[in-house]
């Protein structure tokens, strides 16, 4: 009987990490994990305060808009965030900027007020089935050219772009 209990505990302990990784980081959140109507932390209905401390290394100014909101969670505490899967603006695709047309042809559907923001590439809602909440299916990261090719068309095989669909969780026509 003692061996059965030990075996049961071991199976449970070994399965917990697998279960935790089966879901995306936002999957355990309800709408109120990010959105707050009566207790909003800023002018928008979000439960988190926009990050006013993180500095865009390319412009040397604080991030604004939706990117500042994303960085409220996804930046290190010393840079004004909550430290949840922090992104590095030095080792990430540039964000919080107006795209350079000499480097990329960015579709209007991924721009916010003419800028490349976090939500241009990511849709963080749990209904998004894509790898890393990207707005384009990359088959779990194995076909990143589908994603990069949205804007950097000269860097990919054009035939790989013919079936690209940009995910939008707010599209209720599905």
Q: Where are the regions that the model predicts?
A:
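Flexible linker/context regions in extracytoplasmic redox proteins
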Residues: 21-113, 119-174
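Short, linear, compositionally biased motifs with a strong N-terminal bias
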Residues: 10-13
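N-terminal signal peptide c-region/cleavage motif recognized by signal peptidases
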Residues: 15-19
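Bacterial N-terminal signal peptides that target proteins for export
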Residues: 1-8
